């Protein structure tokens, strides 16, 4: 693909090296705070490196309240970016499931479900019948329980 001729400024208040999720987020949030003299440098194409290879999952539940609140903010931000920027983000809230194949893992998922309630994240422990309704064709043999977080993206 031919590269367009781009003239870079000789100086800027902020120069960000790397156009992955972190670099793009920093540039976005700086401009939201009124710092508009921002240059974002990426050697190829935005989000074409490590960010491009990531699964793109956005989980609502994390081990601390701070990380969980950050995840909630990210969900709200991703949901609004397309309307704000006119750029398709591909963000969808499709939910997530964590499966238990033994009692130890089931107890862990039950603790996570309790923690989710404390952090204000909607979650539920579901049985195999409900799991099959959500994911037709899934093999539930050996699954003793499932944590379902509907609003994960």
Model region roles, listed by residue range:
Residues 9, 89-98, 134-153:
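Helix-loop-beta segment of a Rossmann-like dinucleotide-binding subdomain
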Residues 2-12, 125:
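C-terminal lid/capping helical subdomain adjacent to the catalytic/cofactor pocket in oxidative enzymes
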Residues 31-52:
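Glycine-rich FAD pyrophosphate-binding loop
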Residues 30-31, 116:
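Hydrophobic alpha-helical packing residues
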Residues 56-134:
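Dinucleotide-binding Rossmann-like beta1-alpha1 core, especially the glycine-rich loop
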Residues 8-22, 39:
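Beta1/beta-strand and adjacent pyrophosphate-binding region of the FAD-binding site
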């Amino acid at each position: 693909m031919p590269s367009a001729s781009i003239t870079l400024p000789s100086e800027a208040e902020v120069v960000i090296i790397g156009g992955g999720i972190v670099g793009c987020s920093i540039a976005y949030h700086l401009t939201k705070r009124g710092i508009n003299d921002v240059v974002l440098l990426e050697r190829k194409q935005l989000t074409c490196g490590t960010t491009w290879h990531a699964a793109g999952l956005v989980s609502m539940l994390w081990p601390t309240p701070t990380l969980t609140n950050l995840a909630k903010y990210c969900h709200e931000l991703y949901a609004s970016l397309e309307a704000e920027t006119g750029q398709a983000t591909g963000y969808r809230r499709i939910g997530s499931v964590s499966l238990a194949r033994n009692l130890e893992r089931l107890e862990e998922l039950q603790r996570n479900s309790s923690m989710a309630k404390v952090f204000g994240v909607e979650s539920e422990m579901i049985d195999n019948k409900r799991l099959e309704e959500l994911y037709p064709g899934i093999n539930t043999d050996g699954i003793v329980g499932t944590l379902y977080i509907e609003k994960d993206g």
